[in-house]
């Protein structure tokens, strides 16, 4: 699947929220997205960035040090096999979103498939290794592996992602 690039003016303020409202429609009902639309538009129009957390709630998370990657699989069995393997290799943690519909052009023909979406969180430095591994085990001729840096989020969760994807296992690390 191919999508056009967002114009560069959509990179700051409420633009990220605005873009995300339409980027993952299967995960957020339309009514919920519409309720968030005015906030995104107001933030963009005012030119002010979204409210930042107070210094007491901030931690040592470095923006962009964790990435969210997306991989589509033909079925749940394949998705679970790949997910377990990347977790065992300490490359990532994974959520599976079943029953998505993908519509795309392949070899000159419009295709429509039911797939499973893997939402993968990993250290940004591990994205190349994750991509190589997924490509080596994925059944598709051209596996979808796309990754975006995570600029903000729940710092304890993002720190946990970094812990569970470190190369040396830590016996004190427990999933949340």
Curated annotation (Swiss-Prot):
Key words, A-Z: Signal
One Pfam family it belongs to: CutA1
Keyword Signal annotated: yes
Annotated family: Belongs to the CutA family.
Protein name, per record: Protein CutA
GO molecular function terms listed in the Swiss-Prot or TrEMBL record: copper ion binding
Alphabetical list of InterPro entries matching this protein: Ion_tolerance_CutA (IPR004323), N-reg_PII-like_a/b (IPR011322), N-reg_PII/ATP_PRibTrfase_C (IPR015867)
Gene Ontology annotations of biological process type: response to metal ion
Classification via PANTHER family: DIVALENT CATION TOLERANCE CUTA-RELATED, PROTEIN CUTA
UniProt signal peptide: 1-30
